[in-house]
Amino acid sequence: MNDLSLLPGKAHKPVVRPRDAASLIVLRGHGRDLELLAGRRPGHVKFMPGVYVFPGGAIDPEDRRPWRVESGGAHLPPRLARCARAALRETWEEVGVLIGRPADPNAPLPAATPIERAYCEHGLLAGLDLLTYVGRAITPSYSNRRFNTRFFLSDARNVFGEPVSSEELEDVRWYPIGQHLLDSFRDVTRFMLARAIALRDGTATGDVPLFYWAKNARRIGVCREALIPR
């Protein structure tokens, strides 16, 4: 018997394993004055070119151990702690702001990595407890670049610095949350933003969501990971 799967054109494309990643939703204001910190991915990148997104990216080696300048992370499971650090680091790299709290001016802050030096130079601690876990999303299996992304929320009152564009995100600024902005987002971005707004307003219900695709359809499941207390 011949194996039809070996015939030309019948080979299955291997599914790419998703990389752990993180993204940070930063909001300021209320009601009609509610704004979101976001930017547009450059047109030359391979993943989501020209799309408006929150700052974020894949986990780096420096995110896998506690930073010397962090606080409030002792209660977090290791994977969520890594993702929270990545969200803070990527936000600094992509939009130029730090999320944290003032450090004790009399306590020395040793720094070994660029992100640690950034916090140290500004006299800040990276507050992992200033983040709220919003949800998780997994890129569809047909994509050749896949991410297992944890989304977090923080408030503008925890932001130090002024947002600026970078090589990774263009047109970075505070955007009023209106229909024009929402129309420019992917469905997963709109979903996580709506969840973040509900969490901030205290109107969110249900468990932490898992946004994924199965059989070419969008699915919303329950994320079983531990929550970051608000």
What are these regions (language model features)?
Residues 1-230:
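N-terminal leader/linker segments that precede catalytic domains of diphosphate-processing enzymes
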